[in-house]
């Protein structure tokens, strides 16, 4: 069933059986690792907007304008950076994405998201996501493009070449082809800077023509990006520079236009005042992981 506001489709209704089954499995995985659950939905933040500035919507509350939250990531970062004894933390929240041209079956304008943050590096992130996929029941029955311990994958630029992608950009139909070629799970990593990785993602090495590469991993599940994750940056100057230049500067300028430059920079500089340590994090689209698990025959609540 779809939910409409006027004539505009907003989101689909999620079966409580599917939602309970998937979130139970996600929680159990992170609970076993000693992660703490954080309630982020009652925390207001300007930086709770993702990297695509065209999807940001706003609301007025208590006399101020705020962005409808798209991620709880910054609050998980806050908990991790102010409580270094934590082995990790996670949250389950609602993400509002005002997609300009949503694709049916792929984009939800409002959806639940399960997010996590933990100390560690990019290698630790890939291992954790490998283990999470196994925990959820995913398997790989072939040896094509082995990448992690149990699943196939490849870096962004190699997959651009593999599919001869126009404009050096991978699109939704390329993700569908990854499913057809490699199966239920594919690890897509090392995104070039021109794809506008979020401003607090760590820039690792360089690719062809000295293109900077972010330590970012999208886990393609059931033919769609389902887990978006990355190693976080520790260099304050690097994060500051990326904040002002992401999406060709549109991200910062849109936030300035909506909420005022002084207000935005106050929140940014407060975040950048933390003592940064190696860490990683990511977000899991709950509707997409339900879809992927159904496609793999791992959910049979219908």
Which residue stretches match the model-derived regions?
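A glycine-rich phosphate-binding loop feature that marks nucleotide/adenosyl-phosphate handling sites
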Residues: 43-47, 145-153, 191-193
